[in-house]
């Protein structure tokens, strides 16, 4: 829950006018009340898009406070986050709920960004590989190949988000490669190689270039740094400089 309306639109305006990405797509995920306003700000900006931070697992009905996929597509949203670490932690969203949210996304033409990642305890115990592998198997293995092909994945090392700890580029690459290898247990390798996997562990202007330079890191899910115009512009420029 960051920004008020004026801050959100000012951020979007400054970022979309401050860089012209040619090799990347920049997706803004503003809070629900500001989706339309931010969409209008970036309407004429090339390679900028917009998505929602969450959606309901239900198609519709008496679920006060929920926002359905159909509502989002009715205001021309393109993307939606599913399974963000904060939704998992604070709202107890488990595998079944996340699968239902993915289905709602697909049925209504939204492109989901499915988030996965391990907390500090799993990393410290050496169980991070099994933990993240199970997150993938328990949800994404239930998708059809066509659905998976429409999904973006974001790896969030929860232990490196807002803790002062930072995942090394090598650690990021290890986990991104793991995610691809797990997906290949079920899906065609050629298709899996084409799926974008974003890194979401405290990406900033200082580490973006080294992280984005890893073979299996296809971009970033940027948190706090996206609230600072110059930092976010530097991150976009780092992505643009790769390849």
Regions flagged by a language model, labelled:
Residues 1-67, 149, 154:
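Conserved N-terminal beta1-alpha1 strand-loop-helix module at the mouth
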Residues 73-77, 85-243:
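Expand to "…catalyze enediolate/carbanion chemistry for C-C bond making/breaking, isomerization
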